[in-house]
Amino acid sequence: MSKIYDWFEERLEIQSIADDISSKYVPPHVNIFYCFGGITFTCFLVQVATGFAMTFYYRPTVAEAFTSVQYLMTQVNFGWLIRSIHRWSASMMVLMMILHIFRVYLTGGFKKPRELTWVTGVLMAVCTVSFGVTGYSLPWDQIGYWAVKIVTGVPDAIPVIGQVLLELLRGGVAVGQSTLTRFYSLHTFVLPLFTAVFMLMHFLMIRKQGISGPL
């Protein structure tokens, strides 16, 4: 094992990276309320893992979506558990995100020089809400269908560009297969990609600037 470690150490300087991580200064005022961001990140990882597992069984078509979810819940070993964890972790992620935002705002963590950290956090909050909206529709049951119809119908009230936005979201005038395909793509590829990028930026800036001091 030592020879393998030495081989990697010679090329990647693993020890210096580990020393830098383990020796990072943590201010004495940091308490349990500073954990909300980390818990949100943990929930996101759970979402990725359980969501990936469900893609093996979910079929994003209006004819088979609901049936595939039923099959996952009733026939797949521990399928009900995986979907339940995904659902409850999603709720926990939203709750922890809200608490994290409140904590950062109340402790002044958005002030100079951490404005960009706040901006990336807000962008991740938008992604999180979008996850909820798009994921809610994927079972394609009555609740999901009408939720999509209402949400995608909101932009129609915008003057001039409203109809264009509506058709862009739905993939046409009416809610149908194109809408489900768009929401599935957003939920499983586009939003996770953007969220991962914003998270990386967020963490790098926190790493560079450190945790904000007390008020």
Curated annotation (Swiss-Prot):
<comment type="similarity">
    <text>Belongs to the cytochrome b family. PetB subfamily.</text>
</comment>
<feature type="binding site" description="axial binding residue">
    <location>
        <position position="100"/>
    </location>
    <ligand>
        <name>heme b 1</name>
    </ligand>
</feature>
<keyword id="KW-0249">Electron transport</keyword>
<dbReference type="InterPro" id="IPR048259">
    <property type="entry name" value="Cytochrome_b_N_euk/bac"/>
</dbReference>
<dbReference type="GO" id="GO:0016491">
    <property type="term" value="F:oxidoreductase activity"/>
</dbReference>
<keyword id="KW-1133">Transmembrane helix</keyword>
<keyword id="KW-0349">Heme</keyword>
<dbReference type="GO" id="GO:0045158">
    <property type="term" value="F:electron transporter, transferring electrons within cytochrome b6/f complex of photosystem II activity"/>
</dbReference>
<keyword id="KW-0934">Plastid</keyword>
<keyword id="KW-0408">Iron</keyword>
<dbReference type="InterPro" id="IPR023530">
    <property type="entry name" value="Cyt_B6_PetB"/>
</dbReference>
<comment type="function">
    <text>Component of the cytochrome b6-f complex, which mediates electron transfer between photosystem II (PSII) and photosystem I (PSI), cyclic electron flow around PSI, and state transitions.</text>
</comment>
<keyword id="KW-0479">Metal-binding</keyword>
<dbReference type="Pfam" id="PF00033">
    <property type="entry name" value="Cytochrome_B"/>
</dbReference>
<keyword id="KW-0813">Transport</keyword>
<keyword id="KW-0472">Membrane</keyword>
<feature type="binding site" description="axial binding residue">
    <location>
        <position position="187"/>
    </location>
    <ligand>
        <name>heme b 2</name>
    </ligand>
</feature>
<feature type="transmembrane region" description="Helical">
    <location>
        <begin position="32"/>
        <end position="52"/>
    </location>
</feature>
<comment type="subunit">
    <text>The 4 large subunits of the cytochrome b6-f complex are cytochrome b6, subunit IV (17 kDa polypeptide, PetD), cytochrome f and the Rieske protein, while the 4 small subunits are PetG, PetL, PetM and PetN. The complex functions as a dimer.</text>
</comment>
<dbReference type="GO" id="GO:0046872">
    <property type="term" value="F:metal ion binding"/>
</dbReference>
<keyword id="KW-0793">Thylakoid</keyword>
<dbReference type="InterPro" id="IPR027387">
    <property type="entry name" value="Cytb/b6-like_sf"/>
</dbReference>
<dbReference type="InterPro" id="IPR016174">
    <property type="entry name" value="Di-haem_cyt_TM"/>
</dbReference>
<protein>
    <recommendedName>
        <fullName>Cytochrome b6</fullName>
    </recommendedName>
</protein>
<dbReference type="GO" id="GO:0022904">
    <property type="term" value="P:respiratory electron transport chain"/>
</dbReference>
<keyword id="KW-0812">Transmembrane</keyword>
<feature type="binding site" description="axial binding residue">
    <location>
        <position position="86"/>
    </location>
    <ligand>
        <name>heme b 2</name>
    </ligand>
</feature>
<keyword id="KW-0602">Photosynthesis</keyword>
<feature type="binding site" description="axial binding residue">
    <location>
        <position position="202"/>
    </location>
    <ligand>
        <name>heme b 1</name>
    </ligand>
</feature>
<keyword id="KW-0150">Chloroplast</keyword>
<feature type="binding site" description="covalent">
    <location>
        <position position="35"/>
    </location>
    <ligand>
        <name>heme c</name>
    </ligand>
</feature>
<feature type="transmembrane region" description="Helical">
    <location>
        <begin position="186"/>
        <end position="206"/>
    </location>
</feature>
<dbReference type="GO" id="GO:0009535">
    <property type="term" value="C:chloroplast thylakoid membrane"/>
</dbReference>
<dbReference type="GO" id="GO:0015979">
    <property type="term" value="P:photosynthesis"/>
</dbReference>
<dbReference type="InterPro" id="IPR005797">
    <property type="entry name" value="Cyt_b/b6_N"/>
</dbReference>
<feature type="transmembrane region" description="Helical">
    <location>
        <begin position="116"/>
        <end position="136"/>
    </location>
</feature>
<feature type="transmembrane region" description="Helical">
    <location>
        <begin position="90"/>
        <end position="110"/>
    </location>
</feature>
